[in-house]
C-alpha cells in the first residue's frame, strides 16, 4: 500500500467487472485502478477505454492493465472473475467450477505480497468468500463478499415503488445466502422512522400478500434478468462501488455484506449476508438484529444449505 494513494485492483473484466470499473472511474473513487484478466488483451482494451473517460471524472485516476504483481501495493482487490450464471442455473450450481478457478486466483494474488482487503462478487459469493479467506490466510475482517447488498437494494427499490417513497428512505434488509434461501427481515423494516408493519396495519391499500410478492421478485430478480438479457451487472457494479467507498473512505457504514460469523445469529464458521459496519479495516463489527422466530428458522436453514453445498469443495 502506498501512503496517501488508494490502489484498487480488479480481477475479472467481464460484464460485472467492467460495470464496477466504469462506476469507479465515473465517481473518481481511487487514485489508481488496475485491471487484471486471463485475457490480457481484453484487460488492456478496457483499461484504454476507461482511461479516456478520466477527463470527465470528478477526480483523476491512473488506469492500467496489469498482473497479480500489482496487488502488492493494493489497498483493495475486487474479484469478479469466474464462470457466469446461465439461464436456469442457480448460483449454487456454480460452486465446484468457480471454486477451482478461485483457488488459483487467490494464490496468485497472495504470492505478490498482498496485505489489503478482498472484496468478492463471483457467485456463489458466500462460498467463494469463505474459500478466499481460507486460501489467503488473511484475517476474517479483511475478506468480504458482496453478500446481500444488491438484494437489499432491490428490496428497498421495490418497496419504495410500491409505497411511492424514495428508496433511500426505505430501511429494509435481505439477509442469508445471496440466492434462493435468502430472507427478508420484515420485523425490522422501516419507512423513514415508521415501522412497515405499522404502515400496513393503518392503510388498507397495502397488503401482506403484495409484500410477499415483492420479496419473491427480489429473490428471483437475477433469473428474470438473465432470461431477458443474459446477465446482471449494473446493480452489482454499483453495489461493489458502494462497499468500496465505505472501505476506502473509512465510513463505518452499515451494509449487508457477506461476513464471517462466529456465534452471531447463533451460527459459526460461515460467510453469510448480514448487516455489518464497514470501514478501512474491513468488517469492524457485525450488527446482530433481533430476529423473530420465523426469521431465525429461515436464517438457520440458509446457513445450513450453504455449509452443505460448500463441504465437498473445501
Curated annotation (Swiss-Prot):
This is L-lactate dehydrogenase 2. Belongs to the LDH/MDH superfamily. LDH family. Gene3D superfamilies: Lactate dehydrogenase/glycoside hydrolase, family 4, C-terminal (3.90.110.10), NAD(P)-binding Rossmann-like Domain (3.40.50.720). Substrate binds at residues 85, 91, 123-126, 151-154, 232. GO terms for biological process: glycolytic process; lactate metabolic process. NAD(+) binds at residues 16, 37, 42, 68, 82-83, 121-123, 146. Keywords: Allosteric enzyme, Cytoplasm, NAD, Oxidoreductase, Phosphoprotein. It comes from Bacillus cereus (strain ATCC 10987 / NRS 248). Pathway: Fermentation; pyruvate fermentation to lactate; (S)-lactate from pyruvate: step 1/1. Beta-D-fructose 1,6-bisphosphate binds at residues 156, 171. It comes from the Bacteria.
Amino acid at each position: 500500500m502506498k501512503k496517501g494513494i488508494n490502489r484498487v485492483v480488479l480481477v475479472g473484466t467481464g460484464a460485472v467487472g467492467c460495470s464496477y470499473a466504469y462506476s469507479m472511474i465515473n465517481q473518481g473513487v481511487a487514485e489508481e485502478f488496475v485491471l487484471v484478466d486471463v485475457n490480457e488483451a481484453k484487460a488492456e482494451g478496457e483499461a484504454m477505454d476507461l482511461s479516456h473517460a478520466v477527463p470527465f471524472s470528478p477526480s483523476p485516476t491512473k488506469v492500467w492493465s496489469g498482473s497479480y504483481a500489482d496487488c502488492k501495493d493494493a489497498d483493495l482487490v475486487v474479484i469478479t472473475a469466474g464462470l457466469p450464471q446461465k439461464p436456469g442455473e442457480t448460483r449454487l450450481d456454480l460452486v465446484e467450477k468457480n471454486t477451482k478457478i478461485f483457488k488459483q486466483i487467490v494464490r496468485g494474488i497472495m504470492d505478490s505480497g498482498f496485505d489489503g482487503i478482498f472484496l468478492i462478487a463471483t457467485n456463489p459469493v458466500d462460498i467463494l468468500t469463505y474459500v478466499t479467506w481460507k486460501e489467503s490466510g488473511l484475517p476474517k475482517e479483511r475478506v468480504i463478499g458482496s453478500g446481500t447488498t444488491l438484494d437489499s437494494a432491490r428490496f428497498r427499490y421495490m418497496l419504495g415503488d410500491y409505497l411511492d417513497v424514495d428508496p433511500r428512505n426505505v430501511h429494509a434488509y435481505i439477509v442469508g445466502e445471496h440466492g434462493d434461501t435468502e430472507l427478508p427481515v420484515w420485523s425490522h423494516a422501516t419507512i423513514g422512522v415508521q415501522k412497515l408493519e405499522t404502515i400496513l396495519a393503518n392503510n388498507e391499500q397495502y397488503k401482506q400478500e403484495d409484500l410477499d410478492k415483492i420479496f419473491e421478485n427480489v429473490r428471483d430478480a437475477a433469473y428474470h434478468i438473465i432470461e431477458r438479457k443474459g446477465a446482471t451487472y449494473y446493480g452489482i457494479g454499483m453495489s461493489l462501488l458502494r462497499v468500496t467507498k465505505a472501505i476506502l473512505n473509512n465510513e463505518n457504514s452499515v451494509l449487508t455484506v457477506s461476513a464471517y460469523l462466529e456465534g452471531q445469529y447463533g451460527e459459526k464458521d460461515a460467510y453469510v449476508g448480514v448487516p455489518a459496519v464497514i470501514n478501512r479495516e474491513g468488517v469492524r463489527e457485525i450488527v446482530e438484529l433481533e430476529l423473530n422466530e420465523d426469521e431465525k428458522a429461515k436464517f438457520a436453514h440458509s446457513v445450513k444449505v450453504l455449509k452443505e453445498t460448500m463441504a465437498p469443495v473445501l
